[in-house]
């Protein structure tokens, strides 16, 4: 069975359709893999840590899709959320802030290399 980690880096503050498109593609791929009973983790990384505060809103166009894959969301990069001023929104979304890798100048980040070491595919959007 394949294992896929999908990291959302796109920034909702960019104001463009591309960022929203990348989010939708990440959510859709997560849903497709979930429906095929494959192991999949969705991660919010970098400026993408700003998304959780937005997509938990019922009026957001990606909310229904987000809710459909909520059980496959591994969490939000804690150090990234700090750097991109997204910690409060990420915490309010109820998602876990993950800081399992010490990186100088941060409060800790998600260790993406763990996924590669364990044979996961990594998709960055």
Where are these regions (language model features)?
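Structural motif
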Residues: 3-6, 40-41, 73-75, 96, ...
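Short, glycine-rich nucleotide/cofactor-binding loops
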Residues: 4-24, 50-54
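Histidine-anchored nucleotide/phosphate-binding helix
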Residues: 21-35
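Short internal beta-strands
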Residues: 30, 40-45, 74-80
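N-terminal beta-loop-helix "entrance" segment that forms/cooperates
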Residues: 42, 48-58
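A glycine-rich helix N-cap at a beta->alpha junction
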Residues: 57-87, 92-96, 101
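Low-complexity intrinsically disordered segments
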Residues: 102-105, 110
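C-terminal binding/interaction regions
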Residues: 109-124
